[in-house]
C-alpha cells in the first residue's frame, strides 16, 4: 500500500490535515485505532463559534448540542463574575459525531479512511522512514508514505518513535475526569467554571451544558497531584449537594498544558495537535489549536509535495512558532503565575472582575481592564497579585 | 531507587492513553488493552500519579 501521506489519528487535527491535503489532489490515508472514530471521547466539548468559518467546517446541527452565550466564573468563597453576549459565542459539540464527520469530510475530499487500524511502529528501510506498520483486526499491514503525520493525541507515540522530542515533565499535564449527567439549577446558556486550590488544584471544575438539565461536569488538576481527578470531582459534587444518580457517561483523559514542542518536524514526520502539546495552557482547550496547527501543516505538506522538496516541511515548525508561539508562551506564563494564587487572591480577582467590563476582557481588549485592576489597593499591596497581572500585559 | 512493576486495575481503567503519554520511557502501550513493558520502565511512578481514576498501582520487584 502506497500513499503520499499517512495521517495517524483521526481526532480533530488528523482529519483536517487529511482533508486539506486530499483537496490539493494528493493521496492520503487517515487511520485511527478506534473501531468507531470519535468514540469514546475525552472532551468537555466546548469550542468557540468562530472555528466553523475559520476552518471551513459546516455548522451542522448533528454535532452541535447547544449554543452558548457566555461564561460565569465562581471563586472559592462564592463570588461570581459573568460574561454574557447577546449573540452565540460558543457551542457544546457532540465530539463522537463531530470527529466522525471530520473524517467523513476528509473522505469526501478524496482521502482513504481506516478505522480500527493501530500504528505500532515506523517502517524503516536502510535507516530511512518509509511509512508505518499498523495492525488491523490482528493483521499486520505496511503502509508506505512520503510523509507521516503524527496526530495521535496525548499518547504521542508515533512522533517519539521518529525521534521528535515531545517529552515534558508530569507537571505540564492536567489529569481530567468528567461525568455527563443530569444536573439542574445552572443557567444552561452559559458555561460555568469554579476555581480554588481545595476545589481543583491548578485547574477548575466545569459545567458545560448540553441540554437544559444535562451537562458535561468535569475537572482538571495537575497530573503530579497525590490525589486523583476523580477524587476531587466527587468531593466537589458532594460538598455542593449535587445528586449523582443520573450519570450517562464517564470520560477520563490527560491534557498537555505546557512544554511546547520545539521541533515539530523530523525528516518526513510531522507532529500536530495534542501529540505536539498544542493546547491552550490556561483553559486546557485543544481543539482550536489542533485545527490551527493542522491548517498550517497541511499547507506545507502540499507545498513540499508539489515542489518535491521535503525540506519545506520544516516551514511548518517555523510558521507555527511565528503565528501561535508568542500567544502560547504568554498563556503558559500566565498559567504559571496563576498557579501561585491563594484562594484569597482568587476571591479578590473574581470580585474585582465582577465589577468590570468583562466583555472588553474577553474580546481580547483586556489591556485597560488589567491596568485598572493593577491600581486597586488589594492588588497593589500584593506582589503576587501584581505579578499575575503583569504577565497579562 | 526501588525497581517496580506497574499494575493496572482493568475494571477501573478507561484505556484513555494518558499514562502512555506521561511515561518518559514508552513503557506503556494502550490499545484494546493496557500493556506494560517492564524492561523499558524506569520506575519513576509518574504514570501512577497521573491516572485520573487511580487505576494504576505497583509492586516492588527484585533487581
Ligand atoms: C476531559 C477533557 C476535556 C476536554 N475539554 C475540552 C474542551 O472543552 N474544549 C477543547 O477545545 N478541548 C478540550 N479538551 C482537549 C481536546 O480534547 C484535545 O485537545 C483534542 O481532542 C486534540 O485533538 P487531536 O486531534 O490532537 O487528538 P485526539 O482528539 O486525542 O485524537 C487522537 C486520535 O489518535 C488516535 N490514535 C492514538 N494513537 C494511535 C495509533 N498508534 N494508531 C492509530 N490511531 C491512534 C486516537 O484513537 C485518537 O482518536 C479536553 C480534554 C480532556 C481530556
Ligand atoms: S491513565 Fe489510567 S485510565 Fe487512562 S489508560 Fe492509563 S491506567 Fe487507564
Ligand atoms: S513508572 Fe515511569 S517509566 Fe514506568 S511505566 Fe510508569 S511512567 Fe513509565
Swiss-Prot record, chain A:
Name its pathway: Membrane lipid metabolism; glycerophospholipid metabolism
Q: Could you say which residues bind FAD here?
A: 13, 32, 43-44, 46, 95, 119, 274, 286
Q: Which cysteines are joined by disulfide bonds?
A: none
Q: Does the keyword Magnesium apply?
A: no
Which cofactor names does the annotation list? FAD
Q: Name one GO molecular function term.
A: oxidoreductase activity, acting on the CH-CH group of donors, NAD or NADP as acceptor
**Superkingdom field:** Archaea
Name the GO terms of the biological process aspect. Answer: glycerophospholipid biosynthetic process; membrane lipid biosynthetic process
For this chain's record, the cofactor binding note is: Binds 1 FAD per subunit.
Which residues of this UniProt protein bind a 2,3-bis-O-(geranylgeranyl)-sn-glycerol 1-phospholipid? 327, 363
Keyword Oxidoreductase (UniProt): yes
Q: Which UniProt keywords apply?
A: FAD, Flavoprotein, Lipid biosynthesis, Lipid metabolism, Oxidoreductase, Phospholipid biosynthesis, Phospholipid metabolism
Which cellular component terms (GO) are annotated to the entry? membrane
Reaction(s) catalysed (UniProt annotation)? a 2,3-bis-O-phytanyl-sn-glycerol 1-phospholipid + 8 A = a 2,3-bis-O-(geranylgeranyl)-sn-glycerol 1-phospholipid + 8 AH2; 2,3-bis-O-(phytanyl)-sn-glycerol 1-phosphate + 8 A = 2,3-bis-O-(geranylgeranyl)-sn-glycerol 1-phosphate + 8 AH2; CDP-2,3-bis-O-(geranylgeranyl)-sn-glycerol + 8 AH2 = CDP-2,3-bis-O-(phytanyl)-sn-glycerol + 8 A; archaetidylserine + 8 AH2 = 2,3-bis-O-phytanyl-sn-glycero-3-phospho-L-serine + 8 A
InterPro entries (alphabetical): DGGGPL_reductase, FAD/NAD-bd_sf, Geranylgeranyl_Rdtase_fam, Geranylgeranyl_reductase, GGR_cat
Reproduce the miscellaneous comment text: Reduction reaction proceeds via syn addition of hydrogen for double bonds.
Report the sequence similarity comment from the record: Belongs to the geranylgeranyl reductase family. DGGGPL reductase subfamily.
Role: Is involved in the reduction of 2,3-digeranylgeranylglycerophospholipids (unsaturated archaeols) into 2,3-diphytanylglycerophospholipids (saturated archaeols) in the biosynthesis of archaeal membrane lipids. Catalyzes the formation of archaetidic acid (2,3-di-O-phytanyl-sn-glyceryl phosphate) from 2,3-di-O-geranylgeranylglyceryl phosphate (DGGGP) via the hydrogenation of each double bond of the isoprenoid chains.
Name this protein carries in UniProt: Digeranylgeranylglycerophospholipid reductase
Q: Which species?
A: Pyrococcus furiosus (strain ATCC 43587 / DSM 3638 / JCM 8422 / Vc1)
